[in-house]
Amino acid sequence: MNLSDFDYFLPDELIAQEPLPERDMSRLMVVRLDGKEFEHRLFKDIVDYLNPGDALVINETKVIPARLVGRKEGTGARIELLLLRRLDSSRWEALVRPGKKAPKGTAVVFGEGLLACRILDSTAYGGRVVEFSFEGLFEEVLERVGVMPLPPYIKKPLLDQQRYQTIYARQAGSAAAPTAGLHFSPGLLSRIREMGVAVIPVLLHVGLGTFRPVRTEDIRRHRMHAEYYEITEEASRAIAETRARGGRVIAVGTTTTRCLESAAEEGGRVRPGSGWTEIFIYPGYRFKVIDGLVTNFHLPKSTLIMMVAALAGRERILAAYREAVGLRYRFFSFGDAMLII
């Protein structure tokens, strides 16, 4: 299966540059797994497609201010870091730009000396291992020095940083938002619970595995970067109870899907625990846990569009994307949503 099989045409003006004023007023395209025609609604209408006894599984990760802009000691050259994952109390894996100006041993200072780092080594995927020096709690220093890591296709400054967090974000650690969850408002989530749908939290910290581009034409040669996940005993039990009563398990987002499918056992049981996942889901994959998916519209040739194609079929997803372009849906992180069910 080739990378070009997952390409599509998208005019630049359809890339959403800011969130809508109301989270749940984005548009919703419904893609039915039974092959019925696509439906076009508002996101708040998602309740019309949920049944009492179903479960929505959400990713409660929280985005950290993972983007750091500093100066190289000695030359003053501008160096930018994107924190990917924490290794211990002072060491992180990070993407560094420009990489050619940041060989092993490079020292970088951020925030007028509040934070500094030294580059210790390179990683297999072109990143760096960096060691920070600071006083106090790293999280507090990062809040003062770091900024929200918006994707590069968003050119407009984000005035309200909380709009790049889900309303249920709890555990800090992501370098990007689980964007399908951005559409849920407190009122909508309450309404979903009141109608007898379980809302089950799991955790996957979004890192390079989610947004790293595919560089190989044969997609089977692509290797995912590991991302950390956790599933509690309570969440595992709640999913099993949903299955037992005949309900559907609907994942909110591709990151939730990766989490659940990484811990899946035959028969649809989800194993509780924590670990690192490198699962790569593309057409031909047999889903073990999820029956439906809430997701955004993804970049051409990305691992994320490959995942939704694995669930709904490549040709059907590309047809849905063509229709969305024709109807001028808003795309990517701050864009509109799709429900595959």
Curated annotation (Swiss-Prot):
Pfam families for the chain: Queuosine_synth (PF02547)
Protein's cellular compartments: Cytoplasm
Primary localisation category: cytoplasm
Annotated EC: 2.4.99.17
Top enzyme category: transferase
GO cellular component: cytoplasm
Keywords noted in UniProt: Cytoplasm, Queuosine biosynthesis, S-adenosyl-L-methionine, Transferase
InterPro entries named among the record's database cross-references: QueA, QueA_dom1, QueA_dom2, QueA_sf
Gene Ontology molecular function: S-adenosylmethionine:tRNA ribosyltransferase-isomerase activity
Catalysed conversion reaction: 7-aminomethyl-7-carbaguanosine(34) in tRNA + S-adenosyl-L-methionine = epoxyqueuosine(34) in tRNA + adenine + L-methionine + 2 H(+)
Pathway noted in the entry: tRNA modification; tRNA-queuosine biosynthesis
GO biological processes: queuosine biosynthetic process; tRNA wobble guanine modification
Stated role: Transfers and isomerizes the ribose moiety from AdoMet to the 7-aminomethyl group of 7-deazaguanine (preQ1-tRNA) to give epoxyqueuosine (oQ-tRNA).
Similarity comment: family membership: Belongs to the QueA family.
Assembly with partners or alone: Monomer.
Record protein name field: S-adenosylmethionine:tRNA ribosyltransferase-isomerase
Organism of this sequence: Pelotomaculum thermopropionicum (strain DSM 13744 / JCM 10971 / SI)
